[in-house]
Amino acid sequence: MSTNKVKKVKMATKSCPECDQQIPVACKSCPCGYVFISRKLLNAKLNERSGVMDKLEDKRRRTERIRKEKINLTSTSDMENRRRSRTNSHSDPIRRGRGRPKTVGLKKQEEEKEKQEREVDIYANLSDEKAFVFSVALAEINRKILGQRLIL
């Protein structure tokens, strides 16, 4: 009752054109002497021949988009009327704007100007004695910083 079952392994094979023998695909030559030409060799030979063609293809873009011709359904007089009507609509101030409003930038500039004016006003009311005290304090701070060699 013990029967040995032999599993057949199916391989990818190719047939030799000279002797019609089945040979594994990985083999480059047949035992009869026939040599199979690899695709790499074929491509190399084709590339040598098509050297001139490659130069022509290099000038062209590889990915060219197919452009469809637009059909002009409107006549030129209609287009002129549309252009005129659009120019009139631009003068209307009731346009709904998208995105950030333009006044935001102006407000920031006004705030910066006000800050500068405030700073100028603060120092303008400073007495001569206070200005002298502050200048001495700043000189002392600068001397200490330079003594530490923090600023190179």
Curated annotation (Swiss-Prot):
Bias (Basic and acidic residues): 49-71, 107-118
Coiled coil: 42-75, 102-130
Superkingdom: Eukaryota
Name of the featured protein: UPF0547 protein C16orf87 homolog
Lineage start: Eukaryota, Metazoa, Chordata, Craniata, Vertebrata
Protein family: Belongs to the UPF0547 family.
Annotated region (Disordered), positions in chain: 49-118
Sorted UniProt keywords: Coiled coil
